[in-house]
């Protein structure tokens, strides 16, 4: 038995698939599509400034892109800009609240001031009522005081 110093060569059972460039010709463009959309929206909001609607309307109807880009100063065509001057935008006025703002609770809920002393007093009352309920409950008191233990059927009271 001789041990050879060379490692055995593995035989490939299948041929590797070669990547084709034609299949993914738009891959690079698609990977940056979201960023390009964000940039176009950002440029559109910053670049288009409508100061004089009469000049912009004339430029939009003139049909030459050179005059349109010189009117709005941003290099955008006014064909892309929406002209909503014929629609009236209602002016919203904020309604003044009453002197006492409405309560954020229903009629059954008792409203209390935010006072730490009252809260602690109510907490003490609630905790003492919980303790009383536990002590009154025969099953709960025995489980609470002696720990959880199993009972037989004979121990149950009907």
Curated annotation (Swiss-Prot):
Entry GO CC: cytoplasm; nucleus
Keyword Transmembrane helix: no
Keyword annotations from UniProtKB, A to Z: Cytoplasm, Nucleus
Record bears the keyword Nucleus: yes
Subcellular location: Cytoplasm; Nucleus
Molecular-function GO term, any one: ribonucleoside-diphosphate reductase inhibitor activity
Major subcellular site: cytoplasm
Any one GO biological process: protein localization
Domain of life: Eukaryota
Function, as annotated: Mediates the nuclear localization of the ribonucleotide reductase.
Family: Belongs to the DIF1/spd1 family.
Protein name: Damage-regulated import facilitator 1
